[in-house]
Swiss-Prot record:
Record-level Gene Ontology MF annotations: structural constituent of ribosome
Organism phylogeny: Eukaryota, Viridiplantae, Streptophyta, Embryophyta, Tracheophyta
Keywords for the protein's UniProt record, in alphabetical order: Chloroplast, Plastid, Ribonucleoprotein, Ribosomal protein, Transit peptide
Function statement: Component of the chloroplast ribosome (chloro-ribosome), a dedicated translation machinery responsible for the synthesis of chloroplast genome-encoded proteins, including proteins of the transcription and translation machinery and components of the photosynthetic apparatus.
Region of interest (Disordered), residue spans: 1-40
Cellular component terms (Gene Ontology): chloroplast; ribonucleoprotein complex; ribosome
Keyword Ribonucleoprotein: yes
GO biological process: translation
UniProt cross-references to InterPro entries, sorted A to Z: PSRP-3/Ycf65_sf, Ribosomal_PSRP3/Ycf65
Subcellular location, record wording: Plastid, Chloroplast
Disulfide bonds: none
One Pfam family cited in the UniProt record for this chain: PSRP-3_Ycf65
Protein name: Small ribosomal subunit protein cS23
Length: 181
């Protein structure tokens, strides 16, 4: 006999207790507990149909019915259509906004930097070009070359963006680099 083993004959306290054991399923306990948990909880569809049935019964009996989150009684004053309307859910989807091409600029005392970005609603700004600096290099020509590389930019958009870049460069030249004038 090993010193760590316990036998009912040698320990009277253990021998006098009856042992009750529950039958164990043949499947692993983790999967059976998951199935058991799932079977306890009715699906949401069942809850909605139970709520609708309780509301309809309250309307027929003329009793006030307070559903989940409702502030006003539906029974007595309303009809069965009110119950059906409360079950309808409406989802409003905002209008799809198209991405926009924008010019960003850095206004400095001796330089002005111009870059092309794409603004995507809900996402933010996506840079399409690095900053091109004037008068260090010809920023307008570099921007035009970058716009021509992007085949998906229309000719009209390209002209508008280049005109805006011209206006910004001219404004910077007139002000001498300072924004206070």
């Amino acid at each position: 006999m090993l010193p760590m083993s316990v036998h009912p004959a040698t320990t009277p306290a253990l021998a006098s207790r009856p042992r009750v054991s529950l039958p164990r399923p043949s499947t692993p306990s983790s999967s059976s507990s998951l199935v058991h948990l799932k079977s306890r909880r009715p699906p949401l569809r069942s809850l909605r149909s139970l709520t609708a049935a309780a509301a309809a019964a309250a309307v027929e009996a003329g009793e006030p019915y307070f559903g989940l989150g409702d502030d006003e009684p539906l029974g007595g004053e309303g009809d069965a259509e009110a119950v059906v309307e409360s079950e309808e859910y409406k989802v409003e989807v905002p209008e799809k906004q198209d991405p926009m091409l924008v010019l960003k600029f850095i206004w400095m005392e001796k330089n002005i930097g111009i870059a092309l970005d794409q603004m995507v609603p809900g996402v933010g700004s996506i840079p399409l070009s690095p900053y091109y600096f004037w008068p260090r290099k010809d920023a307008w020509e570099e921007l035009r070359a970058k716009l021509e590389e992007k085949e998906w930019i229309s000719q009209k958009q390209m002209i508008i963006l280049l005109n805006q870049a011209t206006d910004i460069i001219n404004l910077w030249q007139q002000g001498g680099g300072s924004l206070s004038t």
